[in-house]
């Protein structure tokens, strides 16, 4: 393909995905009707992807004046062999379906939903219509700032759900930094999503310097898979390693952190959407929220901006930090 043809394809993609999609969403919002239902059962994915699918569905329904109905997770990739009720445990733990209509109840009244692949395919916003999408990422990528309208609701539901037996790694009185590094067998064919230790070290150096400027006690924890030897570049920062640990504990610790460094992963991206802390984002396939700090592709991060945001966060956080 010639450079000119590539540029033409790029412009065509931009026009279709950005301009036309915005026009479709504007028309949908204008025509939206009471009792037009939307659900996002997700695909056959892992926890992070399925959780993020539902969060994007809640966002789309809320902003477009539709009614979100909840489809609980029934199957998750990487479910332990001895945990047949693993998806149900996560539903109870996350609590996102609390207060929402159940998809099965709406289907009982209206019949099975009409399935489409993208929210732009929903053309009839009429009363008593029922739509099912794998996710609403296409909408969320255009309007990531609108997640801020729901962040309080997400956090309240999550923290109201029972966390029985879940060990959280959080030190009261300190600045708790959680760093998620993506490793594991799921990356065999997705090596571009793996977190590099040298990038993490560069980012941690900036974080450590900023914490020194702010003053006070801090604890840095690294959550990942593998062995400590795989992360030897990070030992110089005195981090606590939490490797191959219980997934509930890991996720909860990410959500609770005062500072959360997310990986190129729906798992930590979804945790960030539930978090009340300061989020440090590295460019990936899902867009950041406007109140997140974005590092460069080379893991660079503006130290002065981080110091400023840390001080503002610490001045306003409750005594228990990001805890509810």
Features from the language model and the residues they span:
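A short, glycine/small-residue-rich beta-strand->loop->alpha-helix junction that serves as a flexible
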Residues: 43-52, 188, 194
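Gly/Pro- and small hydrophobic-enriched strand-loop and loop-to-helix capping segments
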Residues: 62-74, 274-304
């Amino acid at each position: 393909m010639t450079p000119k043809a590539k540029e033409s394809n790029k412009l065509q993609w931009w026009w279709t995905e950005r301009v036309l999609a915005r026009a479709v969403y504007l028309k949908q919002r204008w025509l939206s009707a009471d009792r037009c239902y939307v659900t996002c059962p997700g695909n056959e994915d892992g926890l992070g992807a399925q959780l993020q699918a539902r969060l994007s569905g809640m966002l789309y329904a809320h902003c477009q004046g539709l009614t979100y109905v909840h489809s609980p997770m029934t199957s998750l990739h990487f479910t332990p062999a001895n945990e047949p009720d693993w998806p149900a445990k996560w539903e109870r733990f996350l609590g996102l379906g609390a207060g929402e209509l159940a998809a099965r109840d709406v289907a009982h009244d209206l019949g099975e939903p009409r399935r489409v692949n993208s929210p732009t395919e929903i053309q009839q916003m009429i009363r008593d219509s029922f739509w099912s999408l794998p996710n609403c990422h296409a909408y969320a990528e255009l309007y990531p700032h609108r997640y801020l309208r729901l962040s309080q609701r997400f956090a309240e539901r999550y923290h109201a759900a029972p966390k029985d037996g879940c060990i959280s790694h959080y030190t009261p009185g300190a600045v708790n930094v959680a760093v998620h590094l993506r490793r594991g067998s799921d990356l065999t064919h997705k090596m571009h999503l793996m977190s590099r230790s040298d990038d993490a070290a560069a980012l941690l150096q900036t974080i450590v310097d900023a914490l020194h400027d702010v003053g006070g006690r801090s604890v840095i924890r690294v959550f990942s898979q593998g062995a400590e030897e795989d992360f030897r570049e990070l030992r110089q920062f005195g981090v606590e390693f939490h490797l191959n640990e219980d997934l509930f504990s890991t996720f909860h610790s990410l959500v609770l952190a005062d500072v959360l460094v997310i990986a190129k992963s729906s798992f930590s991206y979804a945790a960030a959407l539930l978090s009340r802390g300061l989020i440090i984002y590295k460019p990936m396939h899902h867009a950041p929220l406007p109140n997140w700090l974005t590092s460069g592709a080379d893991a660079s991060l503006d130290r002065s901006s981080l110091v400023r945001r840390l001080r503002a966060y610490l001045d306003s956080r409750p005594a228990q930090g990001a805890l509810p």
